[in-house]
């Protein structure tokens, strides 16, 4: 029986591992088949057509054959073509992109389809190719929110998680891993106002493509520096809680670079 072939699939390389002297194992995020593992035979050879193409944060179209039905199967890469459209991110934008890749590898199950999230990720990568510094913050926070909502790990942001009481617009609330969204305590370092949380929920809940949702959230966060800055540590704690140990490698690298 001939192996099933997936052709011209939109994809991004999340990570690559040495498999042999000449081959690589790839962790790839595809639009229609989710996160898949592929072996790229001969990709490390100087003459390989794969060599200049299989890079992170670059839009690809790939062809591969399925080696089985299990989620732990490693499939065989047969072709990869760079779609083009933007340059490779550099500096802090590159590190931010690798951080998002690590989140996807930690949080997405193998071969679970997330087409809308893929489209949002593609939009973020385009931003990373052209922006740096403070302009990245609202984009990263927005994608973190979309990712958590897509995989069912983000509570409703317009009610208190434990009581389902609607948020008071003028009150302050904190998002914490163990309790969800709750009234702020004096010990909380980062909180948002009820009106701000409710606006985020409205943006996430609108019946529109994730790319449009992403733009709406970015616009809301970019309107003021405070919401994005206050949201960052709360989302970071929630993401680390669900990613488990050890700390995200890209996050540790950011800490190490800041200490230099």
Swiss-Prot record:
It comes from the Bacteria. One of its GO terms (biological process) is DNA recombination. Coiled coil: none annotated. It holds the Pfam family RecO_N. The keyword Protease does not apply. One of its GO terms (cellular component) is bacterial nucleoid. Keywords: DNA damage, DNA recombination, DNA repair. InterPro entries: ARFGAP/RecO, DNA_rep/recomb_RecO_N, NA-bd_OB-fold, RecO, RecO_C. Involved in DNA repair and RecF pathway recombination. Belongs to the RecO family. This is DNA repair protein RecO. It comes from Paracidovorax citrulli (strain AAC00-1).
